[in-house]
Swiss-Prot record:
Principal place of residence: nucleus
Protein's recorded name: Treslin
Record's signal peptide: none
Species of provenance: Danio rerio
Keywords: Cell cycle, DNA damage, DNA repair, Nucleus
């Protein structure tokens, strides 16, 4: 509370005229008045809060040097300070012998008194520090809040006390000008031309001075020291009224200091000097009270009473209404009606006689101005000469005499005389002068006698035989007053008596009181009572004496009185925090010594036992309960009182409550204390919240929560033998109550409550319970509690000495398997009992937002002591696994900081069985999760085996984690594990091909789920295989989220992986959990892959119109769970009708029900369309984990794009991507890619196009996507590419642009951009932006595949869209969508072929993850559609893993795909066709290629039945393509693919955009690895096709760089880095390309540096950087990977993508790179650079495209960020699971309404800008 600052400005020039005695009396009274003011403030606010000061000034003379005040600052209220003041006051008044007034004439130039007063006030305001705390007193609190506005000053007295806490007070002690004449004298205005009234106000108190007072928050009062003369009656009160008006502006008043109540007669002989001044006439306390109280309070204390005043004038009786206000609030109120009758005038009245009588004084005022003026005029005439008047006051039937005196022109004072006066001989003098002389003599005695008679009657009625009236003040008070040197009047006594206890009673008085009670009276009730009274009196007397003698009244003396011990002395030197801790520790020790019994009683008994403890007091009542009902009612009342009574401590109330129950139970043993309390007293946290609801009574709620919490702790204390589960439940309840308190109040309040009330009582008795409560709250254990905890409470794992702030590690390692909570905790205690306690647990940051990078993983390790190493219990959901054999070896659960490159040296067989590591989020509660492999305590002896990567202080005890989880547990299910990270969906983590032992993945393309395979083969397959999601219709390999699996493929058998991951995914999917973009959810968490099954099935089942399906399909195919044991071929066959069934779903812990297609856009539905339905098995055999090809990849072109896969791109919505795009991205790429035939990329592209996924989004998706599907970007038919541009403009991401064609085109289309590897590892779905022309072969609907996406879109717009997009984008983009769909059919086929080719590519070169970007990795139905059969020809495990796989593509069904949207360009097949593509020979060929894992060329194979765009080019020959893939695991760990086309290939197909794009893509990516087929070979063409190249770009950085959990996963390498980027735009490679790790400040891993690097391809592009970034998905922030972990890393655009982006119009880019790619592929000869191809396609399709590309003609150097990477490295990256597929530019395919491509393409959606078609891409051959 702020200090009370009081300053007295004392005018030393004012001295009452008279003798020296008069002056001395004035000084004495002034000192007394000041002291009384200070004491009243001290009584009100505390003596230590009052600071005061004083200043002397001259108002009538020139300022004297002697008036310099010694102290100009505030002083404390101490005796010495006041003594100094007295001395100085005496000096000031005695320095000048004369009265100042006698010297007035000598000073002709003296200033006016007003100026002197104002100057003094200004000096005081400036000298004193009003707004600062007292620095000399540390106990004084803080600064006082200032009032900045004046408005508060205008009514300061209305609602608050005048001397409120935040005010400073300034008193001017001087004579107040009363009349107008005095006012003029005060202002020195003696001339007749006096200034205007306004000027008078300004001179009285200038505005500047008022402002100063307000700024300093000072209230100004004027203490009038003037004395009334007996014969002085002011004519007017202008002066005092003016002054009061001005003071009211600053909240001040004019108060009398010496003014008497009644005028005194100067001639009275008995007057002494004090009485002459009227000192006793007006009690000082009344003045103080008047200042302290507001007007409202004064009216309440002194209520006005209505009365009638009558007088006789000129023989007529006149009357008027008046009000009577009591002078003292203690006097009785008069009974109405009250009549005052003026009787006459009193002469020579001795006023002193009235002061000794019992009187009651009232102030009489007349509210009526006219009547009042007349009445008071009459009174003035009578009072001339200072005579008082006699009046009669009749109240009811009683008539009393009264003395009336006039105070002012409107105020009079009436003093009612008591009847006792006459009997005591104090009758009024007889010399009364009456107005009517005849009546005076006879009337007066009658009046007196009547009054006396009435009073006698009253006294008799009251049985008062004694006529003496009891004095108002007790005898002891009078005795005390007599001890004083001077006499006191009644007024003084009345004011002093009530405050005597504060002002202090002398020792003499206390001794007298003690003597009074020395002999107990017999009237007392008994001896005991008498003794008690004596003891109290004695104690009081001793206390007063000791306090008076021992202290001088100052606070400091009390401090000095405290005992100073060495401990206290030492603690004074400590910091405040240390002092608090030490006090707590000392209190704990004190409690230990006292024992628990001391807390039961509330107080100590006196020595004589007179005072009983609270327990004793309650016992008698407790024993009287006759029934339990009475007890319960009593408990209810007691409980309610405890809630309402907040003065008592909570523990004492709880103990009293329980003591009542205990005493009752002594006689009723059948009732149990616990049961009774549990049943009738305890309340749940929920019930309390419901009870108070929205009530504002937070205090009661908090109080009740405190009672409930302490009650449970008390129960734990009194019943320590309870079952541990019961105790745990109580702990949780207590934590809930405390959380309620924290929410209602704040954490500081809760901490204080725990420290002050809970810890001291229960710290010694139940420290473990308290520690558990703190753990559950997630707060730090107090040091005092840690000190008393048993040594075995903490485990070495959980604590480190001097542990720093808790990281997420304290929560992140959750117990995955617990046989039982009790057993587990007991085992932990027993295990750690032998270990030294190291330190306290710090606050867990999981309660806050701690970085996920600090997450720990629990990695089951084989027990080195136990024999059966083969039995390994994955920490994934145990429900999926079969319970281990009883004798199964126990696994050691070790907290391991995730390190992607940390391998445990275990034999390959063991590794294959090793379950993927599980990152558990401590936030999810797994309270009673049991280990399936642990049956008894012996099984889980968790010895502390630490992995070197995890420092001791980073490890957390399972016990603590369990406590924290149970405390935060909100879900009902016991098992709530989030596998990779709390947020990200399950998806395959990227694996590094360099770790061969971990590379094992099962390719769904090659094996059916039921088909067994050898372990070696599994291992080989895992290294190059796509995500399981692709492989299995119902299962997604993406379920495996371990970094190892993510990087290197599944290590477990497909069956197991499927069970574990699928079940979890299916569970989540079944729960309807929405798909999440893994990259978005948690930077550290690997995104989960969408189930490919769901997508594939959706794709297959749905007509192309339902674009949603593709979303899922894409995601499912694209993602394979990293550690999923099973990547069974069944996944391939995942043509799940229901997208939700995809196995990946089951695997995904995160809810990812919908296939990416669904999420992405309405187009997803058409992806699921029949085309998708028939999933062709994609040979996304590449090591990329994400690329598992769904078994059944739908050949139907319409669905394939989506079905192909939701590449990771989809998973992570691009930042720029539209909401729909984001939706697509959100779909975790990890969702197993549907077996849908469409390659994931195709799906992604489709998805992306409709969704307008930003390249960033795609990137992030790719990163997040765990499945590294190597699907090459499917080159969409040119038509579809065209569609893509439309979709770009359109809101529908997928449907509008032919995602499929783009996908088929491979990375050229924006899909590559999106393909950027997302964290999850899934290649983001690439928008089917690849040149429409390329895909057009597939989508025959688009008129000219060659045309840019925009043109293609425009053309395709005439054709009906596939179907309304879910988001409605489809409607917007219907035209484009329809084109897209038609193209998509073609695209799907192409994509499928492409996907197969891509997969083949991926398989052939697991080195490069180009296919991450490429559609191949997409395991969507489209991808798998084209592969009719695949066989492992040769396997070699010596000197590197080598496999020869022969696969052939089925012709894709172009006819199935139907476009709902109007495709302007589509002239071919009717829209009503089934969604599947026609099985044209070229389509079949492409399908075969897709199955084989490589694209046979541009996926031109079969155009969908929808009409092809004229520019589409030739359809691929019906002949299915057959390829032989040879995969070789190099020593560097990078797989190497060699594709060999074994079956006939239609050379004519090469030009087809899709085929060509696929081929060029494959060739570009894998050129070194691929053995280029004939020009007619689809692979060759596709390799030449620019779109094919982009995937390689996609694989720029190594994922190996960082652990998935940590911030950055770098892509292994950038396969192709164009030397030049579009000028303003980063080269497609530039933005999209992931900057080399070094650019971000991370050193490139050695293994990356050691990889062979491909020289940067020179890309001559012109264009602006912004466009590239925005327009090209990859370049766009697509280039930047969304995943926070990969922050700063840009996805590398595939060469194809670059070409596409450069050559493709912005709008096309927006749609997707793929469309551009497709067109380029068709247009360009096989050997032509992708840019050239693009240019040709653009020329053929649309001149506008070339124009659009023309602006990209300038050369731009590739940003230095990109590092050249060897060809093999690039290839490995693209193929490697480490790389995520670039997301197709899904969102780019927003609706393109016109044939024009819109420049306003969402960055994600836009394909990468390609340089002008004329530019050539200088591509170096990949090096082995």
């Amino acid at each position: 509370m702020a200090s009370q600052n009081v300053v007295f400005a004392i005018d030393v020039d004012y001295r009452p005229e008279g003798t020296q005695n008069t002056t001395n009396a004035y000084q004495d009274h002034l000192k007394q008045w000041i002291l009384r003011v200070l004491l009243s403030l001290g009584h009100r606010y505390g003596l230590e809060k009052v600071r005061w000061g004083y200043k002397f000034f001259n108002s009538r003379t020139v300022k004297s040097a002697t008036l310099i005040t010694r102290g100009s600052d505030f002083k404390e209220l101490q005796e010495k300070v006041f003594s100094d003041f007295e001395e100085e006051l005496h000096v000031k008044f005695t320095t000048e012998g004369k009265s100042p007034r006698s010297q007035e004439k000598s000073h002709k130039l003296k200033p006016s008194p007003a100026c002197c007063v104002q100057n003094a006030l200004k000096e005081i305001l400036l000298d004193f520090q009003w707004d600062r705390p007292d620095l000399t007193s540390p106990t004084k609190v803080t600064l006082r809040p200032r009032r900045s506005s004046r408005s508060g000053r205008n009514i300061p007295l209305q609602d608050c006390d005048m001397l409120s806490v935040d005010k400073n007070v300034l008193f001017v002690v001087s004579e107040c000008p009363r009349s107008k004449a005095e006012l003029e004298d005060y202002l020195s205005m003696r001339r007749e031309d006096s200034r205007h009234h306004k000027d008078i106000n300004e001179q009285m108190l200038p505005k500047g001075l008022i402002d100063m007072l307000m700024q300093r928050n000072v209230v100004l009062h004027w203490a009038d020291s003037g004395v009334f003369k007996a014969d002085h009656v002011a004519k007017d009160y202008t002066g005092i009224e003016t002054l009061m008006e001005r003071l009211g502006l600053v909240g001040g008043q004019v108060v009398p200091m010496l003014s008497p109540c009644l005028p005194l007669m100067d001639q009275h002989p008995k007057m002494n000097s004090l009485l002459a001044l009227g000192v006793d006439a007006f009690p000082i306390d009344s003045t103080n009270s008047y200042l302290h109280l507001s007007k409202r309070m004064q009216q309440q204390l002194f209520p006005p009473l209505g009365a009638s005043f009558s007088w006789i004038a000129d023989g007529t009786k006149r009357s008027c209404n008046v009000t009577l206000e009591p002078v003292s609030y203690r006097q009785r109120s008069l009974r109405a009606p009250v009549d005052v009758l003026l009787k006459g005038v009193l002469q020579s009245l001795d006023i002193l006689s009235l002061s000794h009588s019992a009187i009651e004084t009232w102030i009489l005022q007349c509210p009526d101005a006219e009547l009042g003026q007349e009445a008071f005029q009459h009174l003035k005439q009578l009072s001339t000469g200072g005579h008082a008047m006699l009046a009669e006051v009749s109240e009811g039937d009683v008539v009393c005499s009264a003395v009336l005196s006039v105070l002012s022109s409107c105020t009079a004072q009436i003093t009612v005389l008591q009847p006792l006066l006459a009997q005591e001989g104090q009758l009024l003098p007889a010399d009364l002068v009456s107005l009517d002389t005849t009546d005076i003599s006879g009337d007066l005695p009658d009046v007196v006698s009547s009054v006396l008679s009435v009073m006698y009657d009253i006294m008799e009625e009251d049985d008062c035989s004694d006529h003496e009236k009891m004095p108002l003040v007790p005898d002891w008070a009078n005795q005390e007053l007599k001890q004083q040197s001077s006499s006191r009047s009644n007024g003084m006594v009345e004011g002093w008596f009530p405050l005597s206890d504060q002002s202090g009673i002398s020792c003499h008085l206390m001794e007298s009181m003690r003597l009074l009670h020395a002999a107990p009276e017999e009237k007392e009730k008994g001896e005991e009572y008498s003794d008690t009274q004596q003891e109290i009196t004695s104690s009081l007397s001793e206390f007063y004496q000791s306090s008076t003698a021992g202290s001088s009244g100052s606070l400091r003396s009390k401090k000095r009185g405290t005992q100073c011990t060495p401990v206290r002395q030492k603690m004074k030197t400590m910091s405040r925090s240390l002092q608090m801790l030490n006090f707590a520790r000392l209190n704990v020790k004190a409690q230990k010594t006292q024992g628990d019994s001391g807390s039961a009683g509330s107080g100590k008994g006196t020595e004589k036992g007179g005072k009983k403890s609270s327990g004793d007091r309650t016992k008698p009542g407790l024993l009287h309960f006759s029934s339990e009902e009475e007890l319960l009612s009593h408990l209810g009342l007691t409980y309610q009182k405890a809630v309402e009574n907040r003065t008592m401590s909570v523990p004492s109330q709880v103990q009293d409550l329980l003591s009542v129950v205990k005493s009752f139970l002594k006689s009723n043993t059948e009732a149990s204390l616990l049961n009774l309390v549990q049943k009738h007293v305890l309340k749940s946290c929920q019930s309390i919240r419901q009870h108070y609801g929205n009530s504002s009574d937070d205090e009661s709620k908090i109080r009740e929560c405190q009672l409930q919490a302490v009650l449970r702790l008390e129960l734990c204390k009194q019943t320590e033998q309870e079952d541990e589960e019961v105790v745990e439940q109580r702990v949780e309840d207590v934590a809930d109550m405390l959380r309620n308190i924290s929410r209602s109040k704040d954490a500081v309040y809760l901490s204080r409550f725990m420290q002050e009330e809970v810890l001291p009582l229960y710290m010694n008795s139940i420290p473990k319970v308290l520690a558990d409560v703190y753990h559950s709250l997630g707060t730090q254990l107090p040091e005092a509690l840690v000190a008393v905890l048993p040594s075995d409470f903490f485990s070495d794992e959980s604590l480190a000495k001097d542990s720093v702030s808790v990281s997420l590690s304290s929560f992140s390692a959750t117990q995955s398997n617990i046989s039982s909570v009790g057993d587990h905790l007991e085992e932990l205690r027993n295990r750690s009992a032998k270990k030294r306690r190291q330190s306290m647990i710090t606050r867990h940051k999981s309660m806050t937002e701690a970085p996920q990078a600090l997450r720990q993983i629990e990695m089951p390790r084989k027990s080195t002591r136990l024999a059966k190493p083969k039995l390994c219990v994955p920490i994934e959901k145990t429900a999926v696994e079969q319970p281990p054999l009883p004798k199964q070896p126990v696994q050691e659960v070790t907290k391991v900081r995730r390190n992607l490159f940390n391998q445990v040296t275990v034999s390959p067989s063991k590794k294959s069985k090793m379950p993927r590591s599980q990152s558990v989020s401590a936030v999810e509660g797994i309270k009673k999760r049991k280990r399936s492999d642990v049956d008894n305590d012996d099984r889980h002896t968790l010895l502390t085996k630490k992995v070197s990567e995890t420092p001791l202080h980073k490890q957390v005890s399972s016990r603590l984690l369990h406590r924290q989880r149970t405390g935060r547990k909100s879900g009902e299910s016991d098992v709530c594990i989030i596998e990779e990270s709390p947020i990200k969906p399950a998806a395959d983590l990227r694996r590094s091909p360099r770790i061969k032992s971990l590379t094992r993945r099962h390719s769904s393309v090659f094996y059916s789920s039921s088909q067994p395979r050898s372990r070696n083969l599994d291992r080989v397959v895992s290294s190059s295989q796509l995500s399981h999601s692709e492989g299995k219709g119902k299962f997604s390999v993406s379920s495996v989220r371990s970094p190892v699996r993510l990087l290197f493929g599944a290590t477990q058998s497909p069956g197991r992986l499927r069970h574990t991951t699928v079940s979890s995914l299916e569970d989540q999917a079944s729960k309807g959990l929405p798909l999440r973009c893994s990259s978005f959810e948690n930077q550290n968490k690997t995104p989960q892959k969408l189930r490919s099954d769901a997508l594939a099935s959706a794709v297959g089942c749905r007509t192309p119109q339902s674009p949603r399906t593709p979303n899922r399909t894409v995601g499912d195919n694209g993602m394979a769970l990293r550690g999923s044991p099973f990547q069974s071929p069944a996944a391939k066959s995942i043509v799940v009708e229901t997208p939700m069934k995809s196995p990946l779903k089951g695997i995904l812990k995160t809810p990812i029900k919908k296939s990416l297609l669904d999420c992405v856009s309405p187009n997803g539905a058409w992806l699921r369309s029949p085309g998708c339905k028939t999933p062709k098995k994609c040979v996304t055999w590449s090591p990329s984990p994400r690329k598992p090809v769904p078994e059944n990849q739908v050949n139907v072109p319409d669905s394939p794009v989506f079905a192909k896969r939701h590449s990771p791109r989809l998973v992570t919505p691009g930042k720029n991507s539209s909401p729909e795009e984001k939706i697509v991205f959100k779909t975790p790429d990890k969702v197993p890619q549907r077996k849908s035939k469409t390659s994931p990329e195709i799906i992604l592209r489709r998805l992306e196009i409709p969704v307008n996924i930003d390249p960033e989004t795609c990137k992030s998706i790719t990163r997040s996507g765990k499945i590294r599907t190597l699907s090459l970007p499917y080159k969409t038919s040119k038509g579809s590419d065209e569609f893509l541009p439309q979709s770009e403009s359109g809101s529908f991401p997928f449907c509008n642009s032919p995602l499929k064609p783009n996908i088929q085109k491979t990375i050229q289309s924006p899909i590559p951009t999106h393909r950027m590897c997302t964290r999850s590892g899934n290649t983001p779905v690439k928008e089917s932006c690849s040149p429409s022309s390329n895909s057009q072969g597939i989508t025959g609907t688009s008129p000219s595949p060659r045309k840019s996406l925009s043109s293609a879109v425009a053309k395709s717009s005439p054709s009906p869209s596939f179907g309304p997009s879910r988001s409605g984008v489809g409607n917007q983009n219907n035209s484009s969508i329809s084109n897209v769909e038609k193209h998509t059919d073609d695209d799907k086929i192409i994509v499928q072929n492409k996907a197969n080719d891509e997969k083949a590519e991926e398989a052939s070169s697991s080195d490069s993850q180009q296919f991450d970007c490429s559609e191949f990795s997409i395991t969507t139905d489209d991808e798998s559609i084209d592969i009719s059969e695949a066989a492992v020809v040769k396997t070699q495990l010596v000197g590197g893993i080598k496999m020869n796989i022969a696969f052939s593509r089925k012709p894709s069904k172009s006819d199935v795909f139907e476009f709902e949207g109007k495709q302007t360009t589509s002239t071919g097949t009717p829209l009503t066709r089934s969604y599947g593509f026609r099985q044209t020979p070229d389509r079949r060929q492409r399908e075969a290629e897709a199955r084989l894992g490589y694209s046979s060329g541009k996926p031109k194979i079969s155009t969908p039945r929808t009409r092809r765009t004229p520019a589409c080019g030739k359809q691929s020959s019906p002949q299915p393509l057959t390829y032989e893939v040879e995969m070789e695991m190099q020593a560097s760990g990078l797989p190497k693919l060699k594709l060999r086309r074994t079956d006939s290939f239609n050379a004519g197909d090469l030009p087809s955009s899709a085929t060509k794009g696929m081929t060029s893509h494959l060739v570009h990516r894998n050129k070194t690895n691929l053995k280029a087929p004939q020009i007619d070979s689809p692979l060759v063409q596709s390799s030449r096709h620019p779109g094919c190249i982009s995937p390689s770009l996609c694989s720029r950085a190594t994922p190996a760089k960082g652990t998935p959990g940590k911030g950055v996963q770098t892509y292994i390498c950038q396969s192709i880095t164009p030397t030049h980027h579009p000028t303003s735009s980063q080269s497609p490679l530039a933005s999209p390309l992931t900057p080399s790790p070094q650019s971000r400040g991370w050193p490139t891993p050695e293994n990356l540096n050691s990889w062979p690097r491909k020289k940067r391809a020179r890309i001559e592009t012109c264009g602006n950087k912004e466009q590239v970034i925005k327009g090209v998905p990859l370049l766009e922030k697509t280039g930047v990977i969304e995943d926070p972990e990969l922050e700063g890393i840009f996805r590398i655009q595939g060469v194809e993508e670059l070409k596409e982006s450069l050559s493709t119009p912005i709008s096309q880019r927006k749609l997707g790179l793929r469309s551009s790619q497709v067109m380029d592929h068709q247009g360009s000869p096989e050997g032509m650079d992708w840019t050239e191809t693009m240019a040709q396609m653009c020329d053929a399709k649309d001149s506008t495209k070339t124009e659009q590309f023309a602006w990209m003609g300038r050369k731009v150097d590739t940003p230095k960020v990109k590092k050249q990477v060897s060809a093999s490295g690039i290839f490995a990256l693209t193929q490697s699971p480490l790389l995520y597929k670039k997301s197709a530019v899904i969102k780019e395919a927003t609706q393109f309404s016109g044939s024009k491509s819109e420049l306003e393409i969402s960055p994600l959606c836009q394909p990468r800008r390609r340089r002008t078609p004329s530019r050539t891409y200088s591509r170096k051959k990949l090096l082995d």
